[in-house]
Every structure is written in structure tokens, then in C-alpha cells.
Amino acid sequence: IVNEQSLMQPDTDFVKIRLEAQRFLEDSCKNNNIGFSVCYFGDVYGNASWFTEMIVNRLKNGTFKIPGKGDYDKCFIHVDDAVGILLSIAKNNLKDQSYVCADSTSVTFKEFVDYTADKIGKKHPGGIPMFLAKGVLGSDLVKLLTTPMKISNQKVSEIYKFVYPSYKEGINSILES
């Protein structure tokens, strides 16, 4: 379970570049006596986002496929909660902190997608072999999407009360809007 004390082990180019940018910003802030805090967000979803475009719309037209079996744990956070956390950090002037930010529910990618399909009355999608997914999306993106991750949001929960404590409430709010 990943928390704020976990060792960083970037295994994709995307994460490596993101951590380099973080180090640059952190160093620049320290050199200029500016407080710095960082949020490590799970997969942020919301209306008119990758969730709507890549999952909902493709489930509706029957073209969505899950990379592999979808049995990898993922961490999700609704965009409203992501913004709420950032506002809480700013309003409370919390400096030199790190926060792991995702909702409180552990879920596999397949469970997340199947729940969405059920809510819109569509069939559960099948999987696509990993080698095909890598051919279409690239191996770095597939690795990023399919790396299992479980987190503890205990620290961030001390400064913020989630509007959507699980992906189910978050998905419902999007689909009902």
C-alpha cells in the first residue's frame, strides 16, 4: 500500500518526467523561500474528461476494450475532490507536505469499467491482449495504465472530507448530470 513515506520507483517515462518536473519545482521554491507541497493523484476523472471520452462514449458505441483482463487495482479520484484537496492545502497554507490523493475504495480497472457499463445499461467490455494494446497505445502508456496500485489516503483525509468517497458516487454524479 502506497503512502507518503513510500519509496518512489518510477517505471515509466511519464512518471520519470513528472518526478523530474516536481524536483525542479521543489528546488526552485526552496531557493526562493516559497512553501511547496505536492499531491500524488490517482486517476482523476470527471465529466467531459478521459472518463467520458474513452470509457462512457466507447462503452455506448461498443468499441471499448480493457487492456488485459483488467484485474489490476487502480486508484481513482473525482475531479471535484482533486480540486477540493488543492483548495484545502492553499486555504490552510500547508507547506512542505506531500499527499497521496485518491478516494477510499480499492477497485480493479475491470470493476470500475463494469460498474460504468451497468449504470449506462451497456454490455461489459471484453479484454484485449496486452501485446495488441501495446501495439496500439505504446508500451509505456499500457504499463502506466495497467500497473496495479493500492494507496492509503489517511493523511489527506485529515485535511479534506471527500465529496465522493468512492468511485461509485463519483460515477453516479457524472452520469446523472
Predicted regions and their residues:
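N-terminal Rossmann-like NAD(P)+-binding domain of SDR-like oxidoreductases, especially those catalyzing
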Residues: I1-Q9
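Active-site Tyr-X1-5-Lys
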Residues: Q9-S37
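NAD(P)-dependent short-chain dehydrogenase/reductase
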Residues: S28-K74, V79
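Mid/C-terminal beta-alpha module of Rossmann-like enzyme folds, strongest
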Residues: I85, I89-D140, N172-L175
